[in-house]
From Swiss-Prot:
It comes from Sulfolobus acidocaldarius (strain ATCC 33909 / DSM 639 / JCM 8929 / NBRC 15157 / NCIMB 11770). It is an enzyme of class 3 (hydrolase). Signal peptide: none annotated. This is Archaemetzincin. Zn(2+) 1 binds at residues 129, 133, 139. The active site is at 130 (proton acceptor). GO terms for molecular function: metallopeptidase activity; zinc ion binding. Monomer. Zn(2+) 2 binds at residues 140, 145, 164, 167. Belongs to the peptidase M54 family. InterPro entries: MetalloPept_cat_dom_sf (IPR024079), Pept_M54_archaemetzincn (IPR012962), Pept_M54_archaemetzncn_arc/bac (IPR012091). CDD domains: Peptidase_M54 (cd11375).
Length: 177
C-alpha cells in the first residue's frame, strides 16, 4: 500500500482536504494530512504573471519533505501556478513529489457561477492525476482515465477521477471506478 502525505500550500477548506483524503483512501492509498500550512512565499511569486513558479516550489517541497517516510507528497493550494514554457499548470510532479494549483479549477476563475461540487470533483481528479505521476505513471490515452492529459478545465471535466485498468495494474492497486 502506498503512503501519501497531503500538504496544504495555502489555507484550505477542510471539505477539500477531507474529500481528497477520502477519495484516495477509497482507492487503496494510506493517506495522512500535514495540518501545518506550508506557506507560499513571495520569492516564488512572479509579479509580472501573478502566478507562482511551480518548478521552484516543487524543489522547495522536495527539499523540505525528502526525509519523510512517504511514497508520495502532494501539495495542494488555492493559487495559480506556471512552469517554464507553459502559461499555467493545474499541477506539476516529479518522482515522489507533486503540486496541485486550484485557482483555475474554480468556475469563478472564468467568470462563471460558483459550483462547489464541480470544484471538488476537479480537485479530486487533478490530485489523483499528480499522484499518479509521483508514482511513475505517464499520461494515458484512455479518455476516461484520470491520467489523461488536460490542457483546459473542460478536459478535466471530461475525464474520470479514477485510474483505468491499465494504470491501476501498473500501480498494483484496486480500481474503484
Amino acid at each position: 500500500m502506498y503512503k501519501v502525505l497531503l500538504i496544504r500550500l495555502t489555507n484550505l477548506d477542510n471539505l477539500i482536504v477531507n474529500s481528497v483524503r477520502t477519495h484516495l483512501m477509497n482507492m487503496g492509498f494510506e493517506v495522512e494530512v500535514n495540518e501545518e500550512i506550508f506557506h507560499l512565499n513571495a520569492e516564488l511569486f512572479n509579479w509580472e504573471r501573478w502566478q507562482y513558479n511551480a518548478d521552484k516550489l516543487l524543489q522547495l517541497v522536495k527539499l523540505t519533505f525528502e526525509r519523510y517516510p512517504y511514497d508520495a507528497v502532494i501539495g495542494i493550494g488555492e493559487a495559480d501556478g506556471f512552469s517554464d514554457g507553459l502559461n499555467f499548470v493545474f499541477g506539476l510532479s516529479t518522482k515522489k513529489y507533486g503540486l496541485v494549483f486550484l485557482s483555475r479549477l474554480k468556475e469563478e476563475f472564468y467568470g462563471r457561477v460558483i459550483n462547489s461540487s464541480l470544484y471538488i470533483e476537479r480537485t479530486l481528479k487533478e490530485v489523483t492525476h499528480e499522484l499518479g505521476h509521483t508514482l511513475g505513471l505517464g499520461h494515458c490515452n484512455n479518455k476516461e482515465c484520470v491520467m489523461n492529459f488536460s490542457v483546459s478545465v473542460e478536459d478535466v471535466d471530461k475525464k474520470g477521477k479514477y485510474f483505468c485498468t491499465s494504470c491501476s495494474d501498473k500501480l498494483n492497486i484496486n480500481n474503484k471506478s
